[in-house]
Amino acid sequence: MSHQPLSCLTEKGDSPSESTGNGPPHLAHPNLDTFTPEELLQQMKELLTENHQLKEAMKLNNQAMKGRFEELSAWTEKQKEERQFFETQSKEAKERLMALSHENEKLKEELGKLKGKSERSSEDPTGDSRLPRAEAEQEKDQLRTQVTRLQAEKADLLGIVSELQLKLNSSGSSEDSFVEIRMAEGEAEGSVKEIKHSPGPTRTVSIGTSRSAEGAKNYLEHEELTVSQLLLCLREGNQKVERLEIALKEAKERVSDFEKKASNRSEIETQTEGSTEKENEEEKGPETVGSEVEALNLQVTSLFKELQEAHTKLSEAELMKKRLQEKCQALERKNSATPSELNEKQELVYTNKKLELQVESMLSEIKMEQAKTEDEKSKLAMLQLTHNKLLQEHNHALKTIEELTRKESEKVDRAVLKELSEKLELAEKALASKQLQMDEMKQTIAKQEEDLETMTVLRAQMEVYCSDFHAERAAREKIHEEKEQLALQLAVLLKENDAFEDGGRQSLMEMQSRHGARTSDPDQQAYLVQRGTEDRDWQQQRNIPIHSCPKCGEVLPDIDTLQIHVMDCII
């Protein structure tokens, strides 16, 4: 895992299955038969320990970066609070300026009053002292000059306050500007290199910054060094693999060169042997041939030694290559078996890079805010100095005004005293007249209270009378309803009686017609006729209703007229 380059990982976290992480793609994987299982177990344990160490280092780095980010957020909150404090101070300065302007206006009014009084005193013939007037005029001139100075300083302060407001508004928009930068892993590594090797403002520490900012920067540099050390370890592993591959290629090239040289030497030896035979046959100098053969033998032995060294280097390189390939295979198996760990590692790397970029942006923003706060502090110091000067001048002006008022109070005219005495007399007279009016009003109020008490009693009596009248009216209505019911019953009974009488008469007439001889007595007929007339008079008397007033006894024809009469009569 430590020797595998970061560029071999894809964006989704999967490792390519066709090509290995190290070495050229055309070379075949070594056989696992060359290694014992103990060596394989040791290598697997080493890889697991390295992987675990890398995980712990990444977790610690993430935790440290998170803590640093929280510290930076707290520091930004402190900066915001300081900015709010500066804003409140600027508001207080504005309020003080407004108060000073109001006081200046009051001073102007007092100056106008003093001018009017001085003119009055100059018009009066009683003024016999000229020196105090000259002193008063000099003091007035001094006050005028002080007022002009105060107005000029007020204008300057207003300009400074407006500039501060503009700067605060412009800086407030860039407080929460935070940009997330997403980029490929290769570009992220390049940005990390630039951050490490750049001599820019990220590493420099200004002299005027506070201790907290310096400690934060040192902590950040330490975290950047830890990340850079991890990246350097990974790169060194990759460079070692590349160096071994290059050494393998060079050794192979040397072997091929040595083989070519050996073949050439063998051909040369055969040629030299043929030439020696010819020379022996021709009997040419045997000593020169022996020396050449010895030299060739020495060259061949040196070449064989070089070949053996190259073979040993090749075997060592092949062993290293086999080990690395086995590690790569184990890592590929592990990656294929646990893709979630790869995703976690990629996420950790991505979060680390993202946090580094965020820290850089936060540092740049912090430096900008520090510069702004320093400018604001300097301007606030200037404002405080000007404010103190204004307060001193204002106090001096107040003292001069108090002295002038004391002098004028000592020079009070008699006319003013007379006017005040006349005003007092008029006020006493007005008070006496108002006191009389108050007494009269109190008497009228007492009478009205007595009238109100009598009115309450009368209202209570009226309510009682009204309740009695309504009760009597309801009783009379009930009696009238009962009378009407009785009249209806009477009418029904009279109709029944008339019907019975008619039936009786008819029966009598029938009986008379049947028994005419028996009923020839005239006295009995007269009695019957008289009885019928009496019954009719009684019925007429019963049908006439009596409507009379209970108070005056007046008889009325209807119940409605009786109700109206009763209301008028009782009230």
Swiss-Prot record:
Region ranges (Interaction with Rab8): 58-209
Residues where Phosphoserine is found: 177, 198, 336, 520
InterPro entries with a match to the protein in the record: CC2-LZ_dom, NEMO_N, NEMO_ZF, Optineurin/NFkB_EssMod
GO molecular function: K63-linked polyubiquitin modification-dependent protein binding; zinc ion binding
Motif position, LIR: 176-181
Zinc fingers, CCHC NOA-type class: 541-571
Compositional bias of kind Polar residues: 201-210
Motif UBAN: positions: 468-473
GO CC, alphabetical: autophagosome; Golgi apparatus; nucleus; perinuclear region of cytoplasm; recycling endosome; trans-Golgi network
Predominant location: cytoplasm
One GO biological process term: Golgi ribbon formation
Coiled-coil ranges (or none): 38-170, 233-502
PROSITE patterns, sorted: ZF_CCHC_NOA
Keywords, alphabetical: Autophagy, Coiled coil, Cytoplasm, Cytoplasmic vesicle, Endosome, Golgi apparatus, Metal-binding, Phosphoprotein, Zinc, Zinc-finger
Region of interest called Disordered, as start-end residue ranges on this chain: 1-32, 100-144, 186-210, 255-291
Record note on modification: Phosphorylated by TBK1, leading to restrict bacterial proliferation in case of infection.
Ligand binding (Zn(2+)): 549, 552, 565, 569
Region (Interaction with MYO6): 406-514
Domain of life: Eukaryota
Annotated compartments: Cytoplasm, Perinuclear region; Golgi apparatus; Golgi apparatus, trans-Golgi network; Cytoplasmic vesicle, Autophagosome
Database matches in Pfam families: CC2-LZ (PF16516), NEMO (PF11577), zf_C2H2_10 (PF18414)
Sequence ranges of Basic and acidic residues compositional bias: 100-123, 130-143, 186-197, 255-268, 275-286
Domain notes: The LIR (LC3-interacting region) motif mediates the interaction with ATG8 family proteins. Ubiquitin-binding motif (UBAN) is essential for its inhibitory function, subcellular localization and interaction with TBK1.
Chain's role: Plays an important role in the maintenance of the Golgi complex, in membrane trafficking, in exocytosis, through its interaction with myosin VI and Rab8. Links myosin VI to the Golgi complex and plays an important role in Golgi ribbon formation. Negatively regulates the induction of IFNB in response to RNA virus infection. Plays a neuroprotective role in the eye and optic nerve. Probably part of the TNF-alpha signaling pathway that can shift the equilibrium toward induction of cell death.
Name of this protein: Optineurin
Encoding gene (name): OPTN
